[in-house]
C-alpha cells in the first residue's frame, strides 16, 4: 500500500495504558498510518510516541495540542480518524472538535452522559461524519452481552457486578451501563421485591438503573477489567463472566472500529453494531 491509501490515525491519550496499546496496534496495521499523538501529561511531551509505547521509534512526537494535530490529519488525502482514550471530563469536547475538523472519532473513553451522546449524535449527523462510541472493544464482552439478553427471557432476577483497576475515573463502567441498557430494552421489569427491603447503609445494594437492574462497582489495584452478570431463579444461579488479563485483547475491536468508522456518516454506539 502507498501512504496515500493508508488511514491516517491520531491517538488522543497516547501515553496512557490504552493509548500505548493503540499506538502499537496502529503501527503494526498494514492499512493505517499514525500521524499524530496527543497527551497532556507533561512528562511525555516531545517524546517519540513509539518509544513511549515500547514499539520503537515512529518519528511521531507526543504533543499537548489536539487542535494542531486535527489540522494535520485533515491535510491527508484520506479522511483521518481520532482514537480517544482520555478522561470523562474532556472526551465530549475532544469528540466535538474532531467532528468539526472532519476527523472521525473512535471513542473508547467512557463517562459520556445521555445528553452528551445525543448532542454528539446530532452534531455528527449534521456534519455527515462517522463517529463510533464503544464502551468495550472486546469481542468476548459483546458475546457476554448477547448471552445475557438471551438469558433474560428465562430469568426475572439479575444483577451486574463490574470490577476495574483503581485508576478508572468513572463508575459504574460504560460497559456495565451498556449491558443494563440492553437488558432494560426488552420490555420487562426485573427483580420483583420478595420482602420489604431496608438499606441500613445507603447504596449497599448498588446503583439502581432502568427496569430495576442494579449495578455494583468495585475498584481495586490488581484488577484490569472484569464483569459478571448474575441471574437467579428458584434453586439455581446462572453467572456470565468476562475477564481481561491484558489490554491487547481490545485491539482487534479498535482496529475494526477504525476501519468501519470511515464508512459511516453518523454516530453509532456499541461494538455489536459493526460486527
From Swiss-Prot:
Enzyme class, top EC level, equals: oxidoreductase
Which GO BP annotation is one of this protein's?
diaminopimelate biosynthetic process
Would you tell me the Gene Ontology cellular component terms? cytosol
Q: Which domain of life is it from?
A: Bacteria
UniProt catalytic activity: (S)-2,3,4,5-tetrahydrodipicolinate + NAD(+) + H2O = (2S,4S)-4-hydroxy-2,3,4,5-tetrahydrodipicolinate + NADH + H(+); (S)-2,3,4,5-tetrahydrodipicolinate + NADP(+) + H2O = (2S,4S)-4-hydroxy-2,3,4,5-tetrahydrodipicolinate + NADPH + H(+)
Tell me which residues this entry annotates as catalytic. 164 (proton donor/acceptor), 168 (proton donor)
**Source species, please?**
Rippkaea orientalis (strain PCC 8801 / RF-1) (Cyanothece sp. (strain PCC 8801))
Lineage, broadest ranks: Bacteria, Bacillati, Cyanobacteriota, Cyanophyceae, Oscillatoriophycideae
Q: Which Pfam families match?
A: DapB_C, DapB_N
> Which PROSITE patterns does this chain map to?
DAPB
The residues the record assigns to binding NAD(+) are 13-18, 108-110
* Binding of (S)-2,3,4,5-tetrahydrodipicolinate, residues: 165, 174-175
Report the subcellular localization.
Cytoplasm
Q: Does the keyword Cell membrane apply?
A: no
Family statement drawn from the similarity comment of this UniProt entry: Belongs to the DapB family.
Q: What is its EC number?
A: 1.17.1.8
The pathway where this protein functions is: Amino-acid biosynthesis; L-lysine biosynthesis via DAP pathway; (S)-tetrahydrodipicolinate from L-aspartate: step 4/4
State the disulfide connectivity: none
Q: What is this protein called?
A: 4-hydroxy-tetrahydrodipicolinate reductase
| Primary role | Catalyzes the conversion of 4-hydroxy-tetrahydrodipicolinate (HTPA) to tetrahydrodipicolinate.
- Which GO terms fall under molecular function for this chain's record? 4-hydroxy-tetrahydrodipicolinate reductase; NAD binding; NADP binding; oxidoreductase activity, acting on CH or CH2 groups, NAD or NADP as acceptor
What gene is behind this protein?
dapB
Q: Which HAMAP family match?
A: DapB (MF_00102)
Q: Which controlled-vocabulary keywords does the entry list?
A: Amino-acid biosynthesis, Cytoplasm, Diaminopimelate biosynthesis, Lysine biosynthesis, NAD, NADP, Oxidoreductase
Amino acid at each position: 500500500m502507498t501512504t496515500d491509501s493508508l488511514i491516517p490515525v491520531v491517538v488522543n491519550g497516547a501515553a496512557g495504558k490504552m493509548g500505548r496499546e493503540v499506538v502499537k496496534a496502529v503501527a503494526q496495521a498494514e492499512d493505517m498510518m499514525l500521524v499524530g499523538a496527543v497527551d497532556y501529561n507533561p512528562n511525555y511531551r516531545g517524546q517519540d510516541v513509539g518509544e513511549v509505547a515500547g514499539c520503537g521509534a515512529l518519528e511521531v512526537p507526543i504533543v499537548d495540542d489536539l487542535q494542531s494535530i486535527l489540522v494535520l490529519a485533515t491535510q491527508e488525502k484520506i479522511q483521518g480518524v481520532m482514537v480517544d482514550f482520555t478522561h470523562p471530563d474532556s472526551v465530549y469536547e475532544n469528540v466535538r472538535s474532531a467532528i468539526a475538523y472532519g476527523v472521525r472519532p473512535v471513542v473508547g473513553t467512557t463517562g459520556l452522559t445521555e445528553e452528551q451522546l445525543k448532542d454528539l449524535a446530532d452534531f455528527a449527523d449534521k456534519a455527515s461524519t462517522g463517529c463510533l462510541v464503544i464502551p468495550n472493544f472486546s469481542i468476548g464482552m459483546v458475546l457476554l452481552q448477547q448471552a445475557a439478553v438471551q438469558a433474560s427471557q428465562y430469568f426475572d432476577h439479575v444483577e451486574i457486578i463490574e470490577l476495574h483497576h483503581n485508576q478508572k475515573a468513572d463508575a459504574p463502567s460504560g460497559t456495565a451501563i451498556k449491558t443494563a441498557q440492553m437488558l432494560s430494552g426488552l420490555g420487562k421489569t426485573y427483580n420483583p421485591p420478595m420482602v420489604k427491603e431496608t438499606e441500613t447503609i445507603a447504596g449497599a445494594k448498588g446503583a439502581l438503573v432502568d427496569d430495576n437492574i442494579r449495578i455494583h462497582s468495585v475498584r481495586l489495584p490488581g484488577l484490569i477489567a472484569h464483569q459478571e452478570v448474575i441471574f437467579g431463579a428458584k434453586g439455581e444461579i446462572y453467572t456470565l463472566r468476562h475477564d481481561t488479563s491484558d489490554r491487547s485483547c481490545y485491539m482487534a475491536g479498535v482496529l475494526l472500529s477504525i476501519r468501519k468508522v470511515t464508512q459511516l456518516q453518523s454516530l453509532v454506539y456499541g461494538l455489536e453494531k459493526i460486527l
